Amino acid sequence: MKNLSYLLLLVLAISVTSCLSNYKESSKSLVIRGDYFGQTPPGDSARLFAPGIISTGMNERDFAITPDGNEIFFCREAGNYRYATIFYSRRSDDVWSSPEVFEFCTNPEYKYIEPHLSPDGTKLYFISTMTADSASEGNEDIWVCTKRDGEWSEPRNLGAPVNATSKEYFPSVTVDGTIYYTHPDTATNEESIFRSRLVDGAYQVPEKLGPNVNIGRARYNAFVAPDESYIIIPAYGMPDSFGATDYYISFRDSLDNWSQPVNMGPGINSTFAREWSASVSTDGNYLFFMSDRMGSTSLGKLSTETLQGFHNSPQNGNTDIYWISTKILDELREKARF
């Protein structure tokens, strides 16, 4: 009986391995062409982005695309955030490569999240727990790669005064090099949104943004427009929230005042909890955002196959990436009050 059980388990393992191998090969052999993986651009309604290619059923978040539209970065998490890394896809002769782990983000001892590209596409910023000596895991710091001759350089730690002994998250950079990011306020220990100006090639002492940006009971992962005209803020504990965390937007005037935050509405926010990573494409046409909203499709009769299919599909309760036209930002701007 033991031998029979062992034999059955062996056959099952071989079958599963074969299926996974075939799936991997078929995914790699799929030819994907066109802008944004050949996806139909969204209008006023949010669409799931690249289902089966980027939005797969795993936890996906943090989207960035180069100005020429030929390189895409995003993040995947697994094992309840035990593993988190950045994936990369490149288009050559109009054919996209299958998304793979970015070459500098392969060490399972570290986390790599929140990729962000400078407006000119020459610098890639991201968060990692890696350390300079690679001896142990450190705090989350901002790292940066520079593009030279079409290739990305080894990442370097951005250093002080932006990085400190505490954790930093979600870098977002303007045309003039100003960097916005999340960092604990030393006075309150609350995660808050800071910015540091770049002057003569050196970052200045970070300043905490005011109460129209640091909103709610918690706020983090703010995306700032390249021209610094608006900032998108995921915030928790707001009185008009649709769910646990919603996306809000604040607009900036010529005197560096920020408007009262505006909830970005039910087209973007939902009653689900995890909505805390947004970005706008470098061409300014599309807003990308993370959400764990569920799909509306019924499974029908429950079975091993239907549950496995649901588990391995987007809109299953893990986070996915959505996109929508940035025309919605113009509509929200009309609601801004200073």
Q: Would you name each region that the model predicts?
A:
Residues 17-18:
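C-terminal motif of bacterial Sec signal peptides marking the signal peptidase cleavage site
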